[in-house]
Amino acid sequence: MRLVLLGPPGSGKGTQATRLKDTFEIPHISTGDLLRAEVAAGSPLGLKAKEVMARGDLVSDDILLGMLEARLGQADVAKGFILDGYPRNVAQANALCALLSKIGQPLDAVVQLDVASELLVERIAGRAKAEGREDDNPESVRKRLQVYTDSTAPVIGFYEQRGKLTRVDGVGSLDEVLERIRKALGR
């Protein structure tokens, strides 16, 4: 199973990716985790990323794709993977499609977790309050959700046009959402 998990901040995609990893016994690949690991390891890509981040810039698609290509070349992805946090825009979706074609590992499915914006604001604000993060006020959360909507809506369309997208209701208990994802994937 080769799967991309999409969803706005607060939709539970990281939590569900971890649960799916255990269910399907395939690795959960988070581009954020990859980036931190490469920087910590001091790899050539990690050094490039560190330099970019030190300037306060976003890490380029090329650097992220290089890290992802290296990760997808590891033995533990032979049975599949769950990709979380990538792609975030259509250029990344095209690059991922080309990479997976090159390595003979096309995607099986893309799951979009749907959760209403107001519930996302409540979830993130509640989580931020519990963690003592005062910068996650409802207005800043709404702005982050708008950025997600603006950049990711075209990605959803990209996969929808290719017949890969499945939308899943992300509201409910962890078990209920996991069961919906499993059913949507035919598992």
From Swiss-Prot:
GO terms for cellular component: cytoplasm. ATP binds at residues 10-15, 127, 172. It catalyses: AMP + ATP = 2 ADP. Residues 126-136 are annotated as: LID. Pfam families: ADK. It is found in: Cytoplasm. Keywords: ATP-binding, Cytoplasm, Kinase, Nucleotide biosynthesis, Nucleotide-binding, Transferase. Its EC number is 2.7.4.3. Pathway: Purine metabolism; AMP biosynthesis via salvage pathway; AMP from ADP: step 1/1. Residues 30-59 are annotated as: NMP. InterPro entries: Adenylat/UMP-CMP_kin, Adenylat_kinase_CS, P-loop_NTPase. GO terms for biological process: AMP salvage. GO terms for molecular function: adenylate kinase activity; ATP binding. AMP binds at residues 31, 36, 57-59, 85-88, 92, 133, 144. SUPFAM superfamilies: P-loop containing nucleoside triphosphate hydrolases (SSF52540). Catalyzes the reversible transfer of the terminal phosphate group between ATP and AMP. Plays an important role in cellular energy homeostasis and in adenine nucleotide metabolism. Monomer. HAMAP family: Adenylate_kinase_Adk (MF_00235). Belongs to the adenylate kinase family. Consists of three domains, a large central CORE domain and two small peripheral domains, NMPbind and LID, which undergo movements during catalysis. The LID domain closes over the site of phosphoryl transfer upon ATP binding. Assembling and dissambling the active center during each catalytic cycle provides an effective means to prevent ATP hydrolysis. This is Adenylate kinase. It comes from Xanthomonas oryzae pv. oryzae (strain KACC10331 / KXO85). The lineage of its organism: Bacteria, Pseudomonadati, Pseudomonadota, Gammaproteobacteria, Lysobacterales. The gene is adk.
